[in-house]
């Protein structure tokens, strides 16, 4: 298709006017139109929350495609894989719509090609692109294309520890071992071991990974702060601060004496004030530095006289107390400032003398980091496994060192687009620069929503471009989208009222002015509604405030939220699914879960703490594996014996523990167990016959597992344990069984993935797990199906990009995490490293007293500079986190915290400064709640768009909280019936009705509580056909006959259809489908299948390959990100005869999850003549699968397919 020209500025202006005067109900804004159609230069779109940035991106891409640009000519970077998938779906939908409406055949052909190319277009995360680039050009750096990604933090730590230990030993015995020993001691802290130093090395390494070139940054910036330190300039800064503080105090005292001080004439404090003024008056502008420092010292010393009250007004006259308090507060602030300056001078003198002594240590640290970074990289190369940061660095190296590759991409891409630009790090920015031709970048983001500093994202990359383009449009076009189409006006006004008083360049990194104000863009949400007014709710507990931890949420705080949720649900018919609770972190949310359960409100936590390895069922399995690996591990063996698999009680374990043999003084528990079995223990009489049978069963089972482990994979071993002891079924019957089974299933898959790597064997697997736990890491929890209509609980970070009708931001009083400001090392991109240096300071003692020096920790000047920088950055990010949380709400916003009303009212919140909270209050505040309360107090005369309300215990009684009235009449009864009852009469009534219930519900009694889909039809038929009559005829009842035939071991067992079917299912699960698999890939996948060779030979790989030639196979390949394979499910079904529920469990072979439909497919290896036979046989089974999916996702349109592999040719048939 011939390319069309892009709109000129004049044409864009005309389009904006046309849109503004049109009769459309929802019009595009002038800024949206400008962002969609502008071209010819770099463009930065600052898109406020809810301003339709995704709409703008999609429409811009569509417009470029309509002008003849191919989707393959666009580079589109998204922040997450999920965002990339959603963008592709939107593009598919929009292109399909345009294709359907178009009458131009040439355009239709072009659009059809673009639709087909979306799946392979460069739309995805930067990580996915750099992997693709490295697969293609990695050979230029000598890298193999079959590398894998080190995604597990635990595996990374293991490799890092190996490299660190090796390098540490080299340096510790090297030429500079004395300096190195001093370097290590500088960071050991109280632990007195090398873990403190190792922790700092890993922290520096993580920082280096976010730079575009770690080695270059080490050489150019690492020591920059120390190399550029100018002590004379710093001393002059302190002097200027001292001058300003002393003159300010002099003015304050003189003003006081000339005015309100007359009310206190003759008071003792005034003598001291006059004495201070004499000293201050001796100073002149040209006085020496020493004069100023001497007067500072004298005034501070005077302030400490009389127990620190020498300059304090004390009065018993009530009418003068307010004047006295005002003076005392002002005096206190100024004197504290002077004391801080005196301390700074004292510290500065030490720094001048000792800071340079730290340079040899820092030089060596730089060398160590350079060696560590390089050696660790070489170690990863031997494993052919890399971190995402490594992949990015390789990609940058290829683009920088090979101009022909760089030119290829710069010429290929018509435009380089990036979403969520505010969360870009320096590595990603360098990649974007190299892919761009210099004037074809399109960047969309919002600095107010940059909340990933802990991932090394740098919002200043966005901010620098914002300022540059704002000041000089020739450098690039700045477009600001501030209309919010998501939220009601009450949410927008509350957000504006908070941030225009909170955020500026000084504290917040941007000025929240008219440029950034949120404006209602949706006409239907622009009219005020009093019931949607934002609320600031504080739980005023009667408990002493010391007992309420700021870190956790109190039960009272949760109760006030529950009270409001019940009101919304009962009075305003708000669905639970429309309500979301936001917290700052994933941890310490147990109280929320418990309180919601108590009030029968469904709650779904969206992503819990990474505590997979701490789940009971997984811990039991890990102890089982430890015992198989080494039975002499007493802890693991005890855990296994006590588990539900073998159920040994405390008494039985004690009896075993007493079975020590006479010959040995010390024995492990397993050895004592063997003594018990052979009657060789000291107390054989304690081992009773039943007890001995349990021991024999345990011993037999354990030995069989140990034998099996020698010749089979971890995956097979784990499933053998599940099957031998029915452990998988057992945990499924426990509370939260679906989650527990998902955890066990994931353990087998993780073990399988582990053995796919270069690591092999049970011993190394156990070692890896133990190292993970030793380093206080864990693995991510496993997701499972959750109820549809439930309140959601998630972190603010998790909520970014989402929207919810009603939002409760909880635990507003939680103190900000200041951990990064207490580290002994602080890194700055501009200034390099800053450290706390432990110096050997000489002291004057009598000659006989030793030592003659002490170790003194001092904050070096670069450390102090970096600390101020990081404090500002941290506070600014907390402001942005609050902004993200507040702008998630569509209808109503609740800000919830806790605190003593009395104490909050007594606190000083400062004065307004140019319409904002004072800089000191904003920078010293430690929680969201303090910011909100300060704004409410300082600007109490303003008509703020949120209401403050304290809630007390008397407002949260059971009667006042209320209860949920379930629409299902059985729910409340069920909850009551499940509790223990002390009502004896009622219990007798139940007992008397047993016979009647047995008769009435015979079908349900005969029907097991848990079945699989394939068993249901076979099970129902005999029960339903009898219509309640006895199922088994006593005369023809089956009685097993003894069979003494010995097995013939000379003949190999015949391969069964079930074995082939299981192997085929495992094969289809293992085949990678990120691209069309060829025969080599299929053979490799088959080799990994855990089955006998005789079984594998029965599998026709040509049929498997032909599947990917079918329409369904092509759809799978094109939508691999939507594919779910071997997915377990569970759902309730109702027995038609008895009306009772039973649990249906099964595993789906696979399905594709789209936004509006699901494609379900099932593999069948049954032999057949006509496909209709299998359709009839499995129709009901697929219906059950479809019901399960429909219930889980709330999607009614489900396409069902059978993939038939048992005929002469492969067939894919759709089942209606």
UniProtKB/Swiss-Prot annotation:
Where do the annotations place ATP binding? 47-54
Q: What is its EC number?
A: 3.1.-.-, 5.6.2.4
Give start and end of each UvrD-like helicase ATP-binding domain: 26-488
Gene Ontology biological process? double-strand break repair via homologous recombination
Query: Is-annotated flag, keyword Disulfide bond?
Result: no
| Gene3D superfamilies on file | 1.10.10.160, 3.90.320.10, P-loop containing nucleotide triphosphate hydrolases (3.40.50.300), PCRA, domain 4 (1.10.486.10)
* Molecular function, one GO term: 3'-5' DNA helicase activity
Provide the alphabetized UniProt keywords: ATP-binding, DNA damage, DNA repair, DNA-binding, Exonuclease, Helicase, Hydrolase, Isomerase, Nuclease, Nucleotide-binding
List residues of the UvrD-like helicase C-terminal domain.
Answer: 514-801
Q: What does this protein do?
A: The heterodimer acts as both an ATP-dependent DNA helicase and an ATP-dependent, dual-direction single-stranded exonuclease. Recognizes the chi site generating a DNA molecule suitable for the initiation of homologous recombination. The AddA nuclease domain is required for chi fragment generation; this subunit has the helicase and 3' -> 5' nuclease activities.
Which family, according to the similarity comment?
Belongs to the helicase family. AddA subfamily.
Question: What is the protein name stated in its UniProt record?
Answer: ATP-dependent helicase/nuclease subunit A
